A protein has these predicted regions:
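Polytopic alpha-helical membrane-helix bundles and their juxtamembrane interface segments
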Residues: 1-205
Length: 205
């Protein structure tokens, strides 16, 4: 239940962020990148559910039904495609943050009020208006994290970089975990309980 609650919160966060970063539209890839966390979480939740089915809940007789077997492997393949997309999306997000554009001739956030921009810090977006600009940042150097849409200051940019790197590393770690589970399921299906691979997996865990 906690996983589902967490999942719903991720969806809400992605929707809120996309309502700002994608307000001018974008390509399908841009949209999927905006919902990278939702896609990533969906894929690994489905995969974990499939592993549970295969390992503990479904009989060998059920798995030997050709149509069912193919359908399950097709779903699993799609999930891995989505996870590969997540690696790409988080990599691009991090890369873009390493190559942001600094705003020239701007030394105060309030100077940006007429431009209808948003300010981001710690993944939280705030509209820059005459009141909020006084409290959002006291720094004098600003960067576009989303060109002509979202800005942040130096400390905010460093925080966004760190968060993006954590997201990238997290999805890579989950891929390693899922690969380990795949091997365990493969060995389980063949009644292999001993050997170098089994010992290695136990040590890795």
């Amino acid at each position: 239940s906690l996983l589902l609650i967490n999942f719903v919160l991720y969806i809400i966060d992605d929707i809120r962020a996309a309502s700002i970063t994608m307000k001018d539209g974008g390509s399908i890839l841009d949209w999927t990148q905006s919902f990278a966390t939702t896609i990533d979480e969906s894929a690994w939740l489905i995969l974990l559910f499939l592993f549970e089915l295969e390992t503990y809940l479904l009989s060998d007789k059920t798995w030997n039904i050709p149509i069912f077997n193919r359908a399950m492997y097709l779903v699993r393949a799609f999930c891995y495609v989505f996870l590969a997309h997540s690696v790409y999306a988080f990599s691009m997000i991090y890369y873009d943050l390493l190559n942001v554009e600094q705003l020239i001739n701007v030394s105060n956030l309030c100077e940006l009020v007429p431009l209808d921009l948003s300010f981001i810090r710690n993944l939280s977006y705030s509209v820059i208006d005459a009141e909020s600009c006084l409290n959002l940042s006291m720094e004098n150097v600003f960067y576009y994290t989303e060109p002509n849409i979202v800005v942040t200051d130096t400390s905010g940019l460093n925080l966004e970089k760190n968060l993006a790197l954590v997201d990238l590393l997290e999805v890579l770690v989950w891929l390693m975990i899922l690969a380990t589970i795949e091997v365990m399921v493969w060995l389980h299906d063949r009644s292999i309980t001993r050997g170098i691979i089994i010992n290695f997996i136990k040590i890795s865990k």
